[in-house]
Amino acid sequence: MFLLYEYDIFWAFLIISSVIPILAFRISGLLAPTSIGPEKLSSYESGIEPMGDAWLQFRIRYYMFALVFVVFDVETIFLYPWALSFDILGVSVFIEALIFVLILVLGLVYAWRKGALEWS
């Protein structure tokens, strides 16, 4: 039988950890002075008057390179706990991790063939 009273501490922690940031934002919004002037509406560029237009276009290669980096960074985050408990988990988890790595290698090969890793 599933007993919910065993999770009282979890629910209390979840509610408190959700209410505290919401209250902090609400209270700071109520207490903070609000004055809108021309200084506040201008763009900020390292303490200097902005030069030119604030709109800059970036090449899509930067985004593709960053996306591939994030994918493999997340892979490292998922594989680290698995590597620490490798001797306890058994063969089935090893096969699942192998499938996970193979899917990521296929993604790397696809990104490589599409030219996402070339910087020229």
From Swiss-Prot:
This is NAD(P)H-quinone oxidoreductase subunit 3, chloroplastic. The chain crosses the membrane at residues 2-22, 64-84, 88-108. InterPro entries: NAD(P)H_OxRDtase_bac/plastid, NADH_UbQ/plastoQ_OxRdtase_su3, NDAH_ubi_oxred_su3_sf. Its EC number is 7.1.1.-. It comes from Oenothera biennis (German evening primrose). NDH shuttles electrons from NAD(P)H:plastoquinone, via FMN and iron-sulfur (Fe-S) centers, to quinones in the photosynthetic chain and possibly in a chloroplast respiratory chain. The immediate electron acceptor for the enzyme in this species is believed to be plastoquinone. Couples the redox reaction to proton translocation, and thus conserves the redox energy in a proton gradient. Keywords: Chloroplast, Membrane, NAD, NADP, Plastid, Plastoquinone, Quinone, Thylakoid, Translocase, Transmembrane, Transmembrane helix, Transport. NDH is composed of at least 16 different subunits, 5 of which are encoded in the nucleus.
